[in-house]
Amino acid sequence: MSILITGASGFVGSHLVDEALQRGMEVWAAVRPSSSRRYLQDERIHFIELDFSSEERLVQQLEGQAFDYVVHAAGVTKCVHPDDFHRVNTEGTQHLVNAILKLKMPLKRFIYISTLGVFGAIREQKPFTEINEHDTPLPNTAYGKSKLEAERFLDSIGNDFPYIILRPTGIYGPREKDYFLMVKSIARHLDFAAGYSRQDITFVYILDVVQAVFLAIDRGMSGRKYFLTDGGVYQSDTFSDLIRQELGNPWCVRLKAPLWLLRIITACGELVGRKTGKPIALNNDKYNILRQRNWRCNIEPTMDELGYHPHYKLEQGVKETVKWYRENHWLSRKAAPKN
C-alpha cells in the first residue's frame, strides 16, 4: 500500500511518516526544496517535491503516480499577512485535490488535517458545553477561516471523492515548537497566562493524532468529520504545573495578564511581523485563541466510528514531551529551535 504524506517534514507529517514506515507502507514524503529532512532520514522514504501554489504544476509533478492514500498535513499556522492563510491552506488544498481528480488517481482515502479552530468561540456561555459536529462553524482566526474554506471545498466535491476530515484540538508532543515556547518560558522561571476567567482547554498528544489518521484510513466513512482530543478538559494552570513538575519544579513567577494587555502585545507582534517579514508567535490569531474560554468538543462519534481511544492523557504526554526536549537539547539556549 502506498501513501503520500504532505507536510512530511513538519511536526505532524514527520510522525505520520514514522508510523507509515512502521506499518510497512510505501511512503512518499511531499516536501519543499527548502524543507529540513532532519526527521526523514529513513532510506525507505521516497521524496517528491510538490508546488501547492499551482494546480497545473501539481498535475505535472504527480503524473504517473498512483497512491492508495493521501494524508494532507501541509499548511501554515502563522503568517505575516492574513491572506497567506487562504493562499496556502485553502488554495493549496484545492489545487492538490483538483490535480488528483484530473489525473483520475484511484485513491482509497484522502485524509485532511483540519482543526477544532474552525468553530471559533461559539460556546462561551457558562456552564460550558461541548462543541459538537452539528454546530455551525464560526471561526475567529484567519487560520480557522482558511481551514473551514478548505473543508467546504471538499464537501462541495461530493461522494465521488473519498475524503475524511480530522479536527484536532491543540496538538503537542516531541518536535512541536509552539507549545515548546511555554516549556522554555517556565524553564526560565516565567509562567504566563491570559485572562482571569475560567478557561477550559483540551489537548491531544501527537501519537494519538497519528493513531486517528490510520484509524480513519482503515475505518472512516467518506465525508465524515471527526474531533480529536485526549478526552480530558483542563485548566491552563494544570498544563503549566505538569510542565514545572517535569522540569524539576523550578521557581517560577506566574503572571496572568488581562486580555486588554494581551491585545496590545499581540497587535505589536503583528506589526513587528509585517515589518520584519517573519511571522511572530504572539499575533492577532494568537490573541483570539487565548481569549477563547471554551475548547471542549465531543469525541464520542470519533470513538464509536473509528474505534479511537486516546492513549496519552495530559500528564503522560507532557512527561514524554519534556523528556524529548531534554534529550534533544531544546532547552539549551544554543540548541533551541528557531520559530
Please state what every model-predicted region is.
Residues 138-164:
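Active-site Tyr-X1-5-Lys
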Residues 46-91, 95, 116, 120-121:
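NAD(P)H-binding glycine-rich loop region in Rossmannoid oxidoreductase-like domains
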Residues 95-142, 164:
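Conserved Rossmann-fold NAD(P)-dependent oxidoreductase catalytic core, especially the SDR/UDP-sugar
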Residues 216-282, 315, 319-322, 332-338:
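Mid/C-terminal beta-alpha module of Rossmann-like enzyme folds, strongest
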Residues 149, 176-181, 194-217, 223-224:
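Substrate-positioning beta->alpha
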Residues 297-305, 309, 313-339:
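Amphipathic terminal alpha-helices
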Residues 206, 241, 265-274, 278-309:
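Conserved C-terminal active-site "lid" loop/helix of NAD(P)H-dependent oxidoreductases
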